Amino acid sequence: MSSLARTTRADVVLVGAGIMSATLGALLRRLQPDWSMTFVERLDAVAAESSSPWNNAGTGHSALCELNYTPQRADGSIDIAKAVRINEQFQVTRQFWAYAVENGMLTDRGFVTPIPHASFVRGARAVEYLRRRQQALAPNPLFAGIELIEDADEFARRLPLMADRRDFSEPTALNWARHGTDVDFGALSRQLIGFCVRGGATALFGHQVHNLTRESDGSWTLLIRNRRTGEKHWCNAKFVLVGAGGDALPLLQKSGIGEARGFAGFPIGGRFLRADNPVLTEAHRAKVYGAPAPGAPPLGALHLDLRYVNGKPWLVFGPYAGWSPKFLKHGHFTDLPRSVRPHNLVALLGVGVTQLTLLRYLIGQLRLSAPDRMRMLREFAPTAVDSDWELTVAGQRVQVIRRDRRRGGVLDFDTTVVAAGDGSIAGLLGGSPGASTAVPIMLDVLQRCFADRYRSWLPALKEMVPSLGVTLSDEPALYEEVYSWGTKILGLDELDEERPK
């Protein structure tokens, strides 16, 4: 091991202070309170990048309203498999939050708010699709009570802002799921990391991991630099999680693990319009997703959301895609070119050839003017006034590109866990569905990276997630039990008391 002015040691180092690192840290603090733990965050606060509610494309979503998760098959039937899988994952996350509140790990449950989720379409063919979607989802316990709303008066009762001056001569419909949520993942991350620090963890803010080297004993030595003073030190860790958002790919590449070979990243930015006028926020009490535009990536479907940021209600509309070679909102313009390696060049070029529709979509988005953006907003809220809305720049999403024998490379919009074969290091790539499924993703990390301990941890994990290992959509009685428990503990009864059983 090289020597510098200072060397520290930790059982676990978590790179990044967002929701992924916060979740794994909280799980490990509960499972192994005797382990030493260090968070290393390049910015000066928790959740200042992708986990911030202003940088997160969707907050609290669980496949209730996102139409790209329920594609139509060639025969006209609806494939709900992905929606069910994501909702199953969200239920795992929701149970852990309830456990954390019940056991004092989370002292303020205001990070999650009950808000209906809705899908919104226009045109006869789209309405028919939404009808079949509702018919396909409703029998599943996880989607019980999802409604199809075609009546204009009922539409106006549910969504006054969207109904005002709308021409209902065109067929218009909603799928409405009253048991949705809004989640401030920034507030949640701060509480989870606070719990870890109270238990003895160290949190280094304004510090960046510049390199990491595997030692002969299987541990990792990280070179960490204080971004304010320039001081450097080494930290030796038995396990490393690279939960650094867009910075994960470069760090995994520096680690040299074979499992990271062939992966590349394609950054997609986002911008939103937002408004805090109380008249508007009172007139739109839901998250409403439209149908994805042709060529748009999954995270590109336009939606008009009510969000709570630090307890304050906002309306947020977008995203409008942006592009930058940066892998982080606060990153560098050299991030993309510096990530290119001989082993991922073919994958990058393959995507460049096969994703022409996506490229055309991005070019079109970059050419949007302020009037264009307001015109798109008025498709959701016809009476929108320019002066009520301001444009805000969201975070970067580095979508995964993986090697493909036939096409060279494919663009993957899911979250991918990359772990070394010996379990000493793991990293998170990709962006969707992301934060809402943080707990099952981290449980996967625990199982893959701590295989020798996982079996002994199972009793404690099943206390945290009572349905662990069970497919809830196949066990409606258990689902109702854990759902009702979580609803009560998280204080989500407000809109849930009339949820159909």
From Swiss-Prot:
GO terms for molecular function: 2-hydroxyglutarate dehydrogenase activity; L-malate dehydrogenase (quinone) activity. GO terms for biological process: tricarboxylic acid cycle. Pathway: Carbohydrate metabolism; tricarboxylic acid cycle; oxaloacetate from (S)-malate (quinone route): step 1/1. Its EC number is 1.1.5.4. It catalyses: (S)-malate + a quinone = a quinol + oxaloacetate. InterPro entries: FAD/NAD-bd_sf, MQO. It comes from the Bacteria. Keywords: FAD, Flavoprotein, Oxidoreductase, Tricarboxylic acid cycle. Its cofactor is FAD. Belongs to the MQO family. NCBIfam families: mal_quin_oxido, PRK05257.2-1, PRK05257.3-2. HAMAP family: MQO. This is Probable malate:quinone oxidoreductase. It comes from Mycolicibacterium paratuberculosis (strain ATCC BAA-968 / K-10).
